[in-house]
């Protein structure tokens, strides 16, 4: 099944919250996730001149703000993080940012998807050309929701998978290797365990 770029978030079998963002692509297999600093993971083209060809190629997919982790499929990562930094509640920061940025104005009207987690709370949201939704969800150890841009842009108990892995590296590899979702390119994970742990693949 091809669901494009997607987020997987839940709890490890040990009960630690995490979120993984994976780029999947039929057309652009030359992307990489790179840890830029202690608070940011970016998606970059391997050939840097490509970033000028499309406004949706280069973006921060992960931002850490205090005790909050934001993960998305686009430049709205920064908007959500900035609003949280200014003191907005997570739900309001998600709502404002998704409505303001709207879906991507590309050939596919690609949805914007987002997940925000702390050690105690988890929110997911999306905006499409016909819908917008934000929801706080309860996480269960060993289980994770997934939210994708193609044929999986919905918030439902039917989009839950079992997960294995104890470290951020384990979880990144698990999501990259998850065979049901086709065309893996790169991925990044934030694990909430004694602070934040970042990993990319």
From Swiss-Prot:
Q: Which InterPro entries match?
A: IMP_cyclohydrolase, IMP_cyclohydrolase-like, IMP_cyclohydrolase-like_sf
| EC nos | 3.5.4.10
Query: Could you tell me what reaction this enzyme catalyses?
Result: IMP + H2O = 5-formamido-1-(5-phospho-D-ribosyl)imidazole-4-carboxamide
Task: Give the superkingdom in one word.
Answer: Archaea
Q: Which GO terms describe its molecular function?
A: IMP cyclohydrolase activity
- Main role? Catalyzes the cyclization of 5-formylamidoimidazole-4-carboxamide ribonucleotide to IMP.
HAMAP family from the UniProt entry: IMP_cyclohydrol
Check the record and name the NCBIfam families matching this protein.
Answer: PRK04151.1 (NF003167), purO_arch (TIGR01922)
Q: What is this protein called?
A: IMP cyclohydrolase
Species source reads Methanococcus maripaludis (strain C5 / ATCC BAA-1333)
Its gene name is purO
């Amino acid at each position: 099944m091809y669901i494009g770029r997607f987020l997987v978030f839940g709890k490890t079998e040990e009960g630690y919250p995490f979120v993984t963002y994976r780029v999947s692509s039929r057309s652009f297999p030359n992307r990489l996730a790179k840890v830029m600093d202690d608070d940011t993971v970016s998606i970059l083209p391997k050939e840097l001149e490509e970033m000028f060809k499309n406004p949706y190629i280069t973006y921060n997919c992960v931002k850490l703000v205090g005790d909050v982790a934001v993960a998305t499929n686009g430049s709205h990562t920064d908007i959500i993080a900035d609003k949280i930094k200014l003191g907005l509640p997570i739900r309001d920061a998600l709502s404002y940012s998704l409505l303001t940025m709207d879906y991507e104005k590309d050939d596919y009207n690609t949805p914007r998807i987002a997940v925000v987690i702390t050690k105690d709370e988890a929110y997911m949201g999306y905006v499409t050309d016909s819908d917008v939704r934000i929801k706080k969800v309860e996480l269960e150890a060993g289980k994770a929701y997934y939210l994708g841009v193609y044929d999986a842009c919905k918030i439902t108990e039917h989009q839950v998978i079992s997960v294995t892995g104890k470290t951020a590296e384990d979880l990144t590899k698990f999501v990259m290797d998850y065979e049901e979702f086709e065309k893996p390119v790169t991925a990044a994970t934030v694990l909430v365990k004694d602070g934040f742990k970042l990993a990319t693949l």
